[in-house]
């Protein structure tokens, strides 16, 4: 006779969202430039210094815009400093931590109000249950 076991638990999607909510208040209150992305790469929370550094408007957290969907103007390291192609933009540390589930560190360039800035970014994936719930990134101006 077959044997069936049933186990009920919170779905990974719910536990992933709970993980992001757990980090939301500390990120928003942080004096450090930090950014919290959800599992889809959308901006979940930002600190005031992060918004200033990346040129993000107040209230960006409520819109849940994707980081590479025009929220931040990422530029290349070339002399012309053109817009970073999407395939390259998806390799920046906050998204790399989401995609690999591992720590990611690297330099990136952003343009805010026409002023290019080079930033050092270190990102860690956040886990909710068995899934990657998001990533937490800290920035430092180079």
Where are these regions (language model features)?
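Short, charged amphipathic alpha-helical "coupling" segments at sensory-output junctions
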Residues: 2-23
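Residue-level signal for short segments within beta-strands and strand-turn junctions
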Residues: 38-39, 112, 141
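A short local loop/turn or secondary-structure capping micro-motif enriched for an aromatic residue
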Residues: 53-55, 126-129
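Per-ARNT-Sim (PAS) sensory domains and their PAS-associated C-terminal
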Residues: 6, 83-102, 106-123, 127, ...
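Short, intrinsically disordered/low-complexity patches at protein termini
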Residues: 60, 68-69, 128-130, 141-142
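PAS-family sensory domains
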Residues: 2-9, 23-25, 30-100, 130-142
């Amino acid at each position: 006779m077959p044997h069936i076991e049933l186990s009920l638990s919170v779905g990974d999607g719910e536990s992933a969202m709970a993980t992001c909510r757990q980090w939301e208040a500390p990120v928003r209150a942080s004096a450090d430039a930090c950014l919290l992305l959800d599992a889809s790469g959308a901006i979940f929370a930002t600190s005031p210094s992060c918004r200033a550094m990346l040129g993000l408007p107040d209230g960006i957290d409520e819109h849940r815009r994707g980081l590479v969907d025009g929220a931040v103007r990422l530029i290349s390291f070339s002399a012309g400093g053109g817009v970073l192609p999407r395939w390259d933009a998806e390799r920046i540390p906050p998204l790399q931590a989401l995609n690999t589930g591992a720590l990611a560190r690297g330099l990136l360039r952003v343009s805010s109000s026409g002023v290019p800035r080079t930033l050092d970014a270190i990102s860690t994936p956040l886990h909710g249950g068995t899934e990657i719930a998001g990533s937490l990134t800290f920035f430092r101006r180079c």
